[in-house]
Amino acid sequence: MSTPAAQHAPEHAEADGTAARARALTKAYGSGETTVLALDSVDVDIARGRFTAVMGPSGSGKSTLMHCLAGLDTVSAGQVWLGDTEITGLKERDLTRLRRDRIGFMFQSFNLIPTLNAVENITLPMDIAGQKPDQKWLDQVIDTLGLRDRLKHRPAQLSGGQQQRVACARALASRPELIFADEPTGNLDSRAGLEVLGFLREAVDDLGQTVVMVTHDPGAAAHSDLVLFLADGRIVDRMERPTAEAVLERMRLFSGGQSQAPATETSLTKPTDED
């Protein structure tokens, strides 16, 4: 665990464009003979202003890595920093504030409040925190995600793709340092999934955001700048400028010759029409 002497990130964490990093990150569940080592002394740097995908076979530790980097789960050993803030030693109240103010989240389930309309769902975390959104930034996010004509619609009046766009806007609304997306296209058809991936790509390219996405889909990973491959709780490989075919081939190496998922059209086309 962290010590009082290690409260700052490694030198130049922000200056060198690092949004988050971990050193010797270890996460174990259970004890004794039943111990399961989900993460095994992982070192990782998440580059600021880039789209990073995390992939691996089932049980490889990819979701656990995201949860530990985001402060959603405690670590068994090692250190994690968000920017220049070490989060492994923070109290729960401080972690809650950090997640609220500096991190955005997207999940496979949209987690929208059914009684609120789209814009109310988008601003809800900031409303709860007593913060006012930057209206210029919020307008830019809404227009980038194509939600201008859907702001008064409740979730039941929106398609799955539109609901995930609302969830994406909610993650972006506070202009966070880092967005974590856990299987964000898992509940969507291929067309809606393409749109959401396109919007995450735009969030990085046009809005200057940093995105870390956990996915099992090689096509989804192909929208990223960098893919990190996990196996048995360790980062075992990485791929710059990935394609779906290259990711699929790499995944076969970690899955005993059987790929986790087929390559999908998400890597071959970009979203065009609105839902």
Predicted feature locations:
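Pre-NBD coupling/linker segments of ABC/ABC-like ATPases
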Residues: 2-14
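Long, low-complexity, intrinsically disordered segments
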Residues: 268-275
